Amino acid sequence: MAVKALNPKAEVARAQAALAVNISAARGLQDVLRTNLGPKGTMKMLVSGAGDIKLTKDGNVLLQEMQIQHPTASLIAKVATAQDDITGDGTTSNVLIIGELLKQADLYISEGLHPRIVAEGFEIAKEKALEVLEQVKVTKEMDRETLIDVAKTSLRTKVHTELADILTEAVVDSVLAVRKPGEPIDLHMVEIMEMKHKSETDTTLIRGLVLDHGARHPDMKKRVEDAYILTCNVSLEYEKTEVSAGFFYKSAEEREKLVKAERKFIEDRVSKIIDLKRRVCGDSDKGFIVINQKGIDPFSLDALAKEGIVALRRAKRRNMERLTLACGGTAMNSVEDLTPDCLGHAGLVYEYTLGEEKYTFIEKCDNPRSVTLLIRGPNKHTLTQIKDAVRDGLRAVKNAIEDGCVIPGAGALEVAVANALVKHKPNVKGRAQLGVQAFADALLIIPKVLAQNSGYDPQETLVKVQAEHAESGQLTGVDLNTGEPMVAAAAGIWDNYNVKKQLLHSCTVIASNILLVDEIMRAGMSSLKG
């Protein structure tokens, strides 16, 4: 052992031992996530060192929050979280398939097959699997109904069914609102706002914006209908200079002059806004609202309140962009060239007070290009759970629109691919066939676990589904309510195409990499110090 001679403290695991260590790590991770695949999966409760509780069913959240010691397990966890970052779904399946690929490969390797040959078989199988994926994808018009099915499939695996059905519509409508033809969809234009009250089923989509602060002046109206909205980034307060400068005055009068000049400078700005308001509103009842990114001092607030203008100060930067998209108009950086064209319009603006906090709702916009999902829930972990789910739901809808096609879900794809691989096996040269067989068997973990989590017998269900698939030639998945086979497409259970594609790629690559490890050395520089 060369390493031992050089560094007696090094820990080394060779050939079979190294493989055994890696495979047991993958299986350990698989066992943890196994029970929360699919809509009937179970919850996991994570308690941090500080006693914070997190209830989740989302594989991604679990993997990020769990403290994973084992190097191989953390490698698999990283792949799965990367899958989530890219596509927003498929983390649990990812871990399950990698674990299962290694488990199947282990059967052959323990009989003396070289890991390299298994890895070659995996590679051949992956190419074939991607071909099958291309054949079975369903290209269809992404109308609202299809998108609702896609979002529902994703959301039901994250939160319970009744809530998923409520969230689905909100999620789909919000993506359709911010979508511009021919441009990539920017999900940042959907603001996700949390309010801690009522119950989670009160989560709604607001076609406009919700700001998390209210007006700062007692005389300003709490509710304005049919309002013009001016978004601006102009300071309406006396600001100190950026460098700390001091003035020496010859006399008190000069100081007065300076103060007056500063005051006038700001008053001029305010009066320009007031002029614009008079021009567009005249004597009518229309409201006028100023939303400013910088500060507004009490004098200016007073002047604006007298004119019946509602002013909000210190809005967030990202909300400025959303405001102009939601209500139209342009954001102004100076008050010199204010014209009626730069104003947006909203049908209703009102302030809502919840406990200590104030929220300003801007609703009934004419053609909102930016919307807000208002998530309500009784406590913090419910809110976090819904927020995670909504993010993934938004991503699923976005993927479906951008792919222009979907894949039947409920384990149907996996059954079809496994079937195609078994047929394809005789065309593969030599011992690599065993790798193909291992890949085919490994994919079947998905329908098996789906059935198992719903309380059915995994083997029996799988055999039924395979028989049905062979007979009808249609993509057949598991009906989780009855445990019988069903045509996934007819039931409206759709998965994202790019999630599955990414899944096949990343699982194969990582499983092959782990198989080909034949030495694990813990011999970093740090261990020499001891």
UniProtKB/Swiss-Prot annotation:
Instruction: Please report which protein family the annotation says this sequence is part of.
Output: Belongs to the TCP-1 chaperonin family.
Gene that encodes it: CCT6
Protein localization: Cytoplasm
Q: What does this protein do?
A: Component of the chaperonin-containing T-complex (TRiC), a molecular chaperone complex that assists the folding of actin, tubulin and other proteins upon ATP hydrolysis.
* Protein's recorded name: T-complex protein 1 subunit zeta
Binding positions (ADP): G38, G90, T91, T92, S93, T157, K158, A410, D495
Q: Which PANTHER family match?
A: CHAPERONIN (PTHR11353)
A single GO BP term for this record reads:
protein folding
Q: What class of enzyme is it?
A: hydrolase
Q: How does it assemble?
A: Component of the chaperonin-containing T-complex (TRiC), a hexadecamer composed of two identical back-to-back stacked rings enclosing a protein folding chamber. Each ring is made up of eight different subunits: TCP1/CCT1, CCT2, CCT3, CCT4, CCT5, CCT6A/CCT6, CCT7, CCT8. Interacts with PACRG.
Q: Residues that bind Mg(2+), according to the entry?
A: D89
Q: Which InterPro entries match?
A: Chap_CCT_zeta, Chaperone_TCP-1, Chaperonin_TCP-1_CS, Cpn60/GroEL/TCP-1, GroEL-like_apical_dom_sf, GROEL-like_equatorial_sf, TCP-1-like_intermed_sf, TCP-1_chaperonin
- Reactions performed catalytically: ATP + H2O = ADP + phosphate + H(+)
Q: Does Nucleotide-binding appear among the keywords? A: yes
